[in-house]
Amino acid sequence: MTASHDEAGLPKPGEAASGTPRNEPSSEPHDEPPAVGGELWRWQLVGDDAVLVDLPDVETVARVGEALRAAPPPGVVDVIPAATTVLVRGSARGRHRWASAARRIAEGSSGPSHVPDAVPADAAGDRSAGTQAAATGGAVAPGPPGARVVEIPVVYDGDDLADVARLAGLTRDEVAARHVAGRYRVAFGGFMPGFAYLTGLDPALVVPRLATPRTRVPAGAVAIAGEYAAVYPRATPGGWRLLGRTDTVMFDPAHDERPALLVPGDQVRFVPAREQIVARASDGADEEPRGVDAPPGAVVATPAEDEALAATVVATHAEDEALAATVVATPAANEQLAATSAVIEVLATGPLVLVEDAGRLGLAAVGVPRSGAADPVALRTANRLVGNRADAAVLEVVLGGLVVRFGATTAIALVGASLSAEIDGEPVLIGRTVRAPAGSTLELGFPTTGLRTWLAVRGGVDARPVLGSRSTDVLSALGPAPLAAGDVLPIGAAFEGLPEVARPVDEAALGSTSSSVTRTGDADLEHRQGEGHVVVLPATPGPRIDRLDDESRERLARQVWVVTADSNRVALRLDGPPLVRADDEELPSEGLVLGAVQVPHDGRPVVFGPDHPVTGGYPVVAVLTAEGITRMAQRRPGDRVRLAIR
């Protein structure tokens, strides 16, 4: 087999750098990835916009992650350390340049505190201020001397303390004492914002997860599972063993520069407490307390290691609304906004309408997903049509039904599902710039095909940003609440040019070329291009495709799957004859990307959407291309799809 490499010299997934299949020895050692510290590092392309490096141990992960977060090359937007890998995400355009630079930096990280000078001095000028701050905010040396040390007070009265004592052959007090005696380090962020996987657990306390996960673990629960320790930032289902509780706030989205108390590289000490004490951090300077009580709330989500619950359907509870940065806080605020002209008044919604933009960048290392529009191409297209910046906030409408009134004359554009739309009774074409007069009303019908429609208005939707983005993240309960009748949305000034002039168009021919799928996400076209009523999802091989047996690997590219009813923005779930893993060996958690196709134990693929967890513990066997992601965003329950892996 002959390997294909991009210009960065990185092999396709499933192939060694020398061109041999994974797990087979190379006959050309000079082409292998370089040996660092006596161990081979394996680099692979992941999808259109990421690279993954396999590393020998958690210490190497810490060094590489630290070096890349401290000096990210231009074009890199996120660095995601995990158990034995580091995933680097960046721009799809020019990946060979930033991937080569990232590889040089990573392979030059010779020690815990060494950051090689491998990026041009003006590199920071190529990143937005928000991305630069996020990417460098976690650049902390992982070990002594001078490491940041965080003390977390714990009341040891957990529901599983007695069971852990029994499994370990210890008393309850001995379990608590051994937990306190540990010296922990943050290895990586996990399934939800602020959830940090801590290494350094006493081997005597290494116990299995619960056979049946709890439906609710309270915020502040101090827990262990396998070789890791952690603190739950928010209430959630989970299968870890609970030793105690803390009142320490682990994650606060109001702190833009450092929303998570713990970042990779931090050292953690648990101290016994019998009264409320806030966390202390020592890094050579006094710090204000982070807070004392985590706000109430629950998100239906799971740790990446809790495989029985991975990528669950997510629902935000009513109490979470206090955490969400809602578009409009009060009826009085609505009335005040309505008195101005540059607003959109929501008269009615269909099943779901969200505010979305390009998402949150640079925060994956502390468990914050990127989120953003379900179809990034549609977001850019809609914004281009009205002369906005590519990342301006739009409305993402699920199954139509939206009715809005414009307070001032503006330009709008609709992109996505095939549906009827009218402004004051006059038809509106999908994928075209349209003038909306002051006081006019836009009504969206139910789509004949497809699922999502994006509405862009000139200037963008000016919802309050949370952690640098106006996007609603249903997994993490970040960003604006779903829209409701009566909401009034301010229009911003995210301009970048003039609206595109509407051209005469043959309505029947709209989206009649293959490029229209990628350009506008036209849903009718997707079905016409499919095989009968099977929608083809273009994809590339995933980094763990070799974890399938030979028959399943071959079947992966021809199997027709059915989209299930529990699909959402977190993941598209597929049903069909299950795939078979080549072995039952557990896979350490590693970073995920939009469009990653993961195969859990039941063998039925899960295709991750924009609100996916940051890390996952199942093999990623394929990754959708940009065109595949566009088509995925339009899939309804019952649709039939096939992965076209190239």
Stretch-by-stretch model annotation:
Residues 2-14, 20, 24, 28-646:
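Conserved "landmark" site that anchors the functional core of diverse proteins
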